[in-house]
Amino acid sequence: MRNTGPITVTKLHPLFGAEVSGIDITRPLSPREFGPIRAAFEEYSVLLFRDQPMDDDKQIAFSELFGPLETTGSANPAAGTKFQRQSNLDIMTGEPIPPDDMRMIYQKANYFWHSDSSFKRVPSLCSILTARVCPPEGGNTEFLCMRAAWDALPPALQATIQPLIAEHALLYSRNRVQKGILSAKAIAELPPVKQRLYRDNPINGRRALYIGAHAGHIVGWPKATGEALLYELSQRADQPEFRLSHAWREGDVIVWDNRAVLHRATYYDAVKHKRFMQRTTIGGNLPTVAQ
């Protein structure tokens, strides 16, 4: 634990992640108050804030301190807004959606390790998830430290993948769940894009392995060979010592760095229990191929 100006930062994991306390992020923050939060974000990659009851306006205001927000595409129930709904509740009735409804099947892709918006030409900086309604058990969010994953790669493998380009698409991750799950409109909105296999932090220079479920193949490689490399990298990254799991309670807010971590949801009983999480996504400023 250490005091950083107006906030206290307590590590959650030896490698990454920290709880930030001593500040109310539901109110407007001055640059002096936000500065230590941004510095902690660059250092720890995942920040947890407890007991921060958010409404939509407050979440937008806090999120915009990190940068401009992405607009949600047509594949999400909150299309056209600045939010992504991660919920089993019908947006009109507030009641649980049947498990065989396409809206619930679509969300199963969140069980795969991924980085939000890696399927966009300019991938996102970070995501902010607020817990509005939590199930009594399950529904955790897990994170992988991809800085540690990169550092653990053999130098020869680092050298091999450094010049490579992967192709990412939302279609690739959704096809892992069920082919035909995306509408033609959603596919047209988000054609495949090219990403490097790493992302660098411009503040501290830390490099992170950049893969995930949206990555489909390696540009210029035979399909099977590229898929095998991506699988090998994912297996090397998914180590218990690189993993942080968070059990949500209402009022929690987590900010995570999409340049430096992968994340995934864990199972909960969506028939018995209600869950409503609301995400904002802060856009990046540079295509990874320009690194």
Predicted regions and their residues:
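Fe(II)/2-oxoglutarate oxygenase catalytic core
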Residues: 2-255, 259-291
